[in-house]
Amino acid sequence: MVLIRVLANLLILQLSYAQRSSELVIGGDECNINEHRFLVALYKSGRFRCGGTLINQEWVLTAAHCDRRNMEIKLGMHSKNVPNEDEQRRVPKEKFFCDSNKNYTQWNKDIMLIRLNSPVNNSTHIAPLSLPSNPPIVGSVCRIMGWGTITSPNETYPDVPHCANINLFNYTVCHGAHAGLPATSRTLCAGVLEGGKDTCKGDSGGPLICNGQFQGFVSWGGDPCAQPREPGVYTKVFDHLDWIQNIIAGNTTATCPL
């Protein structure tokens, strides 16, 4: 009887460990509820679509490929099913793209700036994330987060955002890993070379925070996600600072860097 109990306990421990490990395959562990006050969720027709980043009380930065008609933006959200008491909702008042025709590629101009229909108030779970003051440094440890699938290729979408730490690589690593990428690009390359941690479907537009600075946001990556030697590609915020700041200042004819 004692032996049976010991074996049963070992089995429970094994299953518990396996479950925790599977949760780390794509998006990491559940984010601390207080670490993502700037993270927003983009919805279309009641369905979660993408992430984004609040950069001041009236503006959100995300990926151009996340654009949809009749979008709703949720701020201060942690659980999709259990709202925070200070959760707020907005819709876009205006959307801005690098190209008036919304032309973008996997390596260029996948960026959208959204002006909210009314400003949001800072609260327990809502606060903007500052734009970067310095360029990103290769070798940095970066934080990723989002409500995207935590398994791939089969998709499992969590109720709460997951967070993980990954590394910032030289762009040449992504250039060698993904066919079709040009020799240079205004994107960042980040991931874990041994695989197992990555952003994935549903994480698009969510932030890449390196050494505490908002350096990028999710653009695209390999399929399946989190494969060895296939880091993800992130739009580089620092290269678009002038365009972002000009648009916010009212210069809506500003152009993105070539």
From Swiss-Prot:
Record-listed E.C. numbers: 3.4.21.-
CDD domains named among the record's database cross-references: Tryp_SPc
Glycosylation sites: N103, N121, N122, N154, N170, N251
Gene Ontology BP term (one): proteolysis
Propeptide: 19-24
Keyword Cell wall biogenesis/degradation: no
Pfam family of the protein (one): Trypsin
Enzyme class (EC, first level): hydrolase
Peptidase S1 domain location: 25-249
Intracellular or extracellular location(s): Secreted
UniProt family annotation: Belongs to the peptidase S1 family. Snake venom subfamily.
Protein name: Snake venom serine protease KN12
